[in-house]
Amino acid sequence: RHFDWDGRLAPTNLATDAEILAVASVVDEVGVGVIQVGGDQALGKQIAEVSGRPVFYGNITQQAVAPDRWRSRLAEAEEMLRRGHRAYQFVMPRPGDLRYTLKTAQHFDALPSWKTVMLMSLDDRKEAFRDPATRAKLHFEAVETPLNPENAGEFSRRWDLQFVFQPALAKNENLTGKSIAQIAEEQGKDVLDVFLDLALEEDLETEFERREVNSDEEAMSVLLNSPHTIIGQSDGGAHVVFRTDYSYSTYLLSHWVRDRGIMSLEEAIRKLTFIPASLFGLLDRGLVRPGMVA
């Protein structure tokens, strides 16, 4: 949900679908402009149908919680374009790595006991993490309970994809780059005990990293090369506590072009410049041509 500078909900949070579709239906009369829709894919497709303008209605990711869901999302994008609608989904070239500490983590919020603990003061939170009864509840939710893959925001239970990114204490530097599952196996401990014990030892300053999104490079190669997707989807620094996405263009050029060779340099430049410029109606840029913006 988004708010304006005065703390009021943005109009799009309050408008009905009918009102949004009514506004979208006259955008094409102006002859310029694009529409972005976040979250509601069904509404995004309806807007594409009534507006006649380019619509960006989400992003396709490869996710550990549902490893093959991207295939149906890509087929959906292809079908929309076949029907003549300029409806596109973004693909982020970077892995969706999120770095966090147990002072700031949000990705346990769909688990009720975790959410309760994470809303506590830091001192109370540390006491809760130490409490055996509370830890048993946290273990039940984050280790024992099966994942619901339909809940996109739910913690994956993939402790092999939760890594120690930066320990706070020099004595724990040897854990850098190891997954919680790997450390648990090496120490003969439960994954949750490893996770919480390390965080508590370092006063919740341990920086972890979750690598659950866009980690399958074969799937990503298909998505990035698809003519039905648009490369992009930086958050512009909105979640800088957890990640910074502004490097997506250089990551495409360095990792995917130079290191992996999944497309030519020329094609990558076209996908980063000419294609988005054309879709956004910026017709004076995107090509190296006399009179165009450099």
Where are these regions (language model features)?
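Catalytic histidine neighborhood in serine/cysteine hydrolases
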Residues: V30
